Amino acid sequence: MSLFTFVQIRVFPFLQRHLFFLQLSLTLIGLSWIFILPRNEIIDRLHVSESALLPGQVNTYFENRYSKTVSSSLTAANTWSHLDASVGTNTMYDDLEQIFTAMGLPTQKQNYSINIPGSEFNGSNFITTLRAPRGDATESLLLCVPWKDHIGQYNEAGVALAISLLKYFQGWSLWSKDIILVIFDDPVYGPSSFLTSYFDQTTPYISYTPLKIRSGSIQAGLSLELVTTENNSDVLEVLYQATNGQLPNLDLFNTISRIFMQHFNYPLRLQGYDFHANSGSSYTSRLKSLWMGMLTQAVSNVTSAHALFPQYRIDMLTLRMKVKDPFSFDMFRFGQAIESTFRSLNNLLEHLHQSFFFYFILDHLHFISIGNYMPSILILAASFMLGAYRHWINHEKKIDLWRPFSFWLFSIFCTIAAYYLVSSSTKITVFIFLYLMLTFIGIIFSTFMTSEDAELVLSYDLMSKSLFISVVSTLNFSLSFVVAILLVPLQFISFRFNRRLSLLFAVLTYFSTFIFLCSLSKILNGPLVPFWLWAKEYELFNSWLMPSVFMILVLPEIIFSVTSFFSLWNEPSVKTKTKTL
């Protein structure tokens, strides 16, 4: 007997008889894969792949002799924060124009207006550029400083340090790339309007003053948030997740980590956990860091300036530190670290590309590459496809396949329409109305559907989920994995055995959307209903992954779980003779 014949006669029939157990095995393997990733045998050590960076290999000279410049900048920033409530940023931008014009640098105040349904915002950015003495204005580096962070805390030390550094940088002739300094009045709307105008894009929601100051291709950049708070902290928090789950090149983080930790002895905060230069990490801490990184990447909400730049092929990080008193903060130590970072980025001959763009950072020493974590979601997608096949082979041959397919397709359209209807409001009553409306649609469908129709609808649904999860995982692994976990009960609904257990799975699937929203509310520290937030980010920031996944993967399960529940409930008895489990 040939191998092909053996597989066809023996293996395939055996697998077909035990599809349910094979599907269950794949699901357990896919879910447990994540718990293997933080082990020492799997993780990789962080290292700089781009040899041209040479992080920390230069002498820094931003020292106490520049204390007069730093002191005057801090005094001015403190004055601007006191005047902000009455005159806004007008006084600050006027003073900045005088400062940089006296230095011989071009300046511009860019006004912009954000208009979307339910929200309107008017603001302005300040832009200046230090031309490279040894460059030809074809490449540049970016230094961004939001005047306030996303919760309204002033960034006095950050603005003062940026002014002092640009004055200091002007005295050196080693720069081969222009240095663009942008000060935003808002950490989200400001970068959005700046990028839209810098790349000559048009959008119906943003109107802005055209940029007169331009430079070459932006290679990389940093955003400084040295926010003034009641508590002082010497820990540097590094933010790197961007919209749609995008990430900057890993070499940018490696450069920051090596310079700030090894050369200037700053502790680093990643995903809410602090790490010191000489400290290690345990399996438990790495697992917690991995989960927090996955949740943050899955949400991909825009709260800092760096989040919008990777979609324009600009590698960007936000460096955040809490400063109780800007005048007692060690500006020179932090400024030397920024100087060393920009000196390293100045060595680049091309865009960062040698290292990874898909990864999870576990601590200051280790990360997980895409080749190690992707099998988990692909195994889960395979289990969904097996579930679709299990329901498919059980249908009667003479049944009209277009009928259940039409039900499935119409359910998707109803869900998308319902999402757009409620995306302009944050009231909880709107969310309840959405839930009840989709539930009512599911009840209506169940009155016209037989159990065979419901089983085929479930087959179509699982097949589409498998394909969509596989595609989304290549763009945002975390989001696809979280959604796959929420949909696990759906794939174990069975019309052939154990009706009570299948009814329980249908109920769990029905409430999975509510659980999903509550989890997001905890992560975002915001309202229970983030529909309006997602719609705003979709229109302004091209953040399309979350709303599209929610419309296509999560909300339809309200309808499908209801139809499956009532089809199972109305079934007179569980079938005992089945083709397969």
From Swiss-Prot:
Q: Where are the transmembrane segments?
A: 18-38, 367-387, 404-424, 428-448, 468-488, 501-521, 549-569
Please indicate the ranges of residues that lie on the Lumenal side.
39-366, 425-427, 489-500, 570-581
Annotated InterPro entries: Gaa1 (IPR007246)
Its Gene Ontology cellular component terms are:
endoplasmic reticulum; GPI-anchor transamidase complex
Chain ranges for the short sequence motif Prevents secretion from ER as given in the UniProt record: 577-581
Pfam families referenced in this protein's UniProt entry, alphabetically: Gaa1
Q: Which domain of life is it from?
A: Eukaryota
Q: How does it sit in the membrane?
A: Multi-pass membrane protein
* Membrane side Cytoplasmic: residue ranges: 1-17, 388-403, 449-467, 522-548
Q: Does the keyword tRNA-binding apply?
A: no
Could you confirm whether the keyword Transmembrane helix appears in this record?
Answer: yes
Which keywords label this protein? Endoplasmic reticulum, GPI-anchor biosynthesis, Membrane, Transmembrane, Transmembrane helix
Which Gene Ontology terms describe the biological processes this protein takes part in? attachment of GPI anchor to protein; GPI anchor biosynthetic process
The listed locations are: Endoplasmic reticulum membrane
Q: In which pathway does it act?
A: Glycolipid biosynthesis; glycosylphosphatidylinositol-anchor biosynthesis
PANTHER family (UniProt xref): GLYCOSYLPHOSPHATIDYLINOSITOL ANCHOR ATTACHMENT 1 PROTEIN (PTHR13304:SF0)
What role does this protein play?
A: Component of the GPI transamidase complex. Required for a terminal step of GPI anchor attachment onto proteins.
Protein's name according to its UniProt entry: GPI transamidase component gaa1
User: What organism is listed for this UniProt entry?
Assistant: Schizosaccharomyces pombe (strain 972 / ATCC 24843)
